[in-house]
């Protein structure tokens, strides 16, 4: 059965996203091993992408903070899951970048094992935002991660980055290409979001999408720890 591609967010959903991301957002936990994860609590939305895809820039643009998620000086250097508390209503999880060519095979395998264990076993994980660079062709590592997400049975949504650097006709073609690819993956949410952390294009749309998973305001203080 063909997936139906959802429409853009409503004005009310955009406002929900604005309110959520206007709240405080603070780093509260970093984990290099799967047995060091923080206790489950708030719903989680994780961000995945190749090294240099602009993941840190997107997280900073979403939260309106310049240095919340710091980009590593060497692609793929930071191999840990970083957890951020967003307004006590949602946790944002910055996953280590993948596709780092200089890394040893054993390092890549360790990354995949840790990511699969996190994805498969994290009951509070609501969605993975998979970031792809709109300027370049999909890499084998991107397709590998999509297959990993399918196997882990975790819903993922493709978000294109650096779209301000792509001409409109080429961007439309890229969106169509990625939409077709998403329809082939069981775990893929079929709606693609095009963004630019530089211009803010698509950021309110992505905020609205993520806000769907946050604890509702009236119950945000119930059963949640401060971390």
Curated annotation (Swiss-Prot):
Cofactor: Mg(2+)
Binding positions (GTP): 49-56, 76-80, 94-97, 161-164, 195-197
Binding site for Mg(2+): 56, 78
One GO CC annotation: cytosol
Any one of the GO BP annotations: division septum assembly
Classification via PROSITE patterns: G_ENGB (PS51706)
SUPFAM superfamilies reported in the protein's UniProt record: P-loop containing nucleoside triphosphate hydrolases
Keywords from the UniProt entry: Cell cycle, Cell division, GTP-binding, Magnesium, Metal-binding, Nucleotide-binding, Septation
Residues annotated as domain EngB-type G: 41-216
Molecular functions (GO terms): GTP binding; metal ion binding
Domain of life assignment: Bacteria
Transmembrane segment boundaries: none
Its job: Necessary for normal cell division and for the maintenance of normal septation.
Family per record: Belongs to the TRAFAC class TrmE-Era-EngA-EngB-Septin-like GTPase superfamily. EngB GTPase family.
Descriptive protein name: Probable GTP-binding protein EngB
